[in-house]
Amino acid sequence: MRIAILADIHGNQVALEAVLEDLAQQAGIEHIVVAGDLCLNGPCPKEVLDTLRTLPCSVIQGNVDNDVFNETKKGPKKQGIVTWTREQIGAEGIDYLAALPFSKRIENPDGTDLLVVHANPLDQEEALVPSLQDNKLEQLLGKLPATTGALAFGHYHVAYTRRWRGLLLVDAGSCGMPRDEDIRASYAILTWRDDAWQAEHRRVKYDLKAVVKQLKNCGMPNADKRIKILTEAKY
């Protein structure tokens, strides 16, 4: 069993297309799960949603997807981006985001399951950062069923793998807005092999200059901040 995990596309259609092209070359992929944060903060929110709707994949909801369909009140800069994004995706796109589930469980007939969430199994906001201490992990993960052998997620935009009490934790990184000092698009492949889940992190080059040009020309408010994040790939 091989499952691809994409997360945090953030309206970056160029990066998404590059990842899908790389993914098409990987053998034995049985399913794709997109772990939320689909369209806010990037130049092509509608194009990203249109692409995802054509794919044979599962898509779950992220925190900024919630912001878009709920029109959650934020500071004036973020509110401007939310309003612009809603205008781009229209009522159909807003309804699509609202209908997305919180999580996706991949049942494994040969062993433990894979659970995919956006940030953590309890909410869409608190990040599972690599340095999280045991007591906090217990709070966020301690009630997962024993049948869960791997947890895949995004939200933090930093790709990493660690184990906690036998549970494989995999942050797929960000497809469209990495922040781990690597400007390449990120995704992960989880494989059930030798009675255990294993993770492979993949990085894919894409035309960053084209995305910067799109951001400058698309009319999205506060685009300069997004350009800085894309070109520096860090917090």
Briefly describe each language-model feature range.
Residues 31, 127-131, 138, 166-168, ...:
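Metallo-beta-lactamase
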Residues 1-4, 105-115, 164-168, 197-198:
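Beta-strand-turn-beta hairpins that frame and shape the catalytic cleft
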Residues 26-28, 89-161:
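His/acidic metal-ligating clusters that form di-metal
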Residues 57, 147-150, 197-199:
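Short active-site oxyanion
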Residues 2-98:
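Core catalytic region of metal-dependent phosphoesterases/phosphodiesterases
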Residues 10-15, 40-43, 64-70, 124, ...:
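Active-site environment of divalent metal-dependent phosphoester hydrolases
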Residues 163-235:
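Acidic, His/Gly-rich catalytic cores of divalent-metal-dependent hydrolytic chemistry
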